[in-house]
Regions:
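Catalytic cores of alpha/beta
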Residues: 21-29, 46, 65-81
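Anionic-ligand binding region
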Residues: 9-11, 19-34, 44-50
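Glycine-rich phosphate-binding active-site loops on the catalytic face of alpha/beta enzymes
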Residues: 1-2, 35-44, 76-98
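C-terminal helical cap(s) of enzyme catalytic domains, especially alpha/beta-barrels
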Residues: 6-8, 74, 90-118
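Glycine-rich beta-to-alpha transition loops that act as phosphate-gripper elements at the mouths
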Residues: 15-20, 39-41, 60-67
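Aromatic/hydrophobic pocket-lining residues that form π-stacking "cages" and hydrophobic walls in ligand
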Residues: 2-3, 22
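Short beta-strand/loop segments at the ligand-binding rim of alpha/beta enzyme cores
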Residues: 5-14, 53-61
């Protein structure tokens, strides 16, 4: 019902899942992409393993994605990156360091651009 409602209003629907069965169930129900959580417990190889027989899947890792692992996830086939605390740093927010937050966002964007340009 949630996926159907999202599509009714032309919104992308990205439910969370972990196991291959959960991921396939979400896509069969019409999900546009599936966020895999907690991705860091399985690592980028898990995405490679999932995508080998099912390359049509659009997956985004969430949980533990940071500047050190972003390229690994993209190289493993991630369609997007779910980045939380590695991008929205509490200390930068508390200090109202918007330039610092913007710099972090640029670093992530640069990694995405560099990784995608390599393929």
């Amino acid at each position: 019902a949630v996926i159907e409602m999202g599509h009714r209003y032309d919104r992308p629907v990205v439910p969370g899942a972990l196991t291959p069965t959960e991921i396939l169930t979400a896509f069969a129900a019409g999900a546009d992409m599936v966020k895999v959580f907690p991705a860091n417990h399985f690592g980028p190889k898990y995405f490679k393993d999932l995508l080998a027989p099912m390359p049509q899947l659009k997956l985004t890792p969430t949980g533990g994605v940071d500047l050190d692992t972003a390229a690994d996830w993209l190289n493993a086939g991630a369609t997007a990156l779910g980045v939380g605390s590695a991008l929205v740093k509490k200390d930068l927010i508390k200090a109202r360091d918007w330039a610092g937050l913007a710099a972090l966002a640029r670093q992530f964007r640069n990694i995405v651009d560099q990784t995608r340009n390599q393929s």
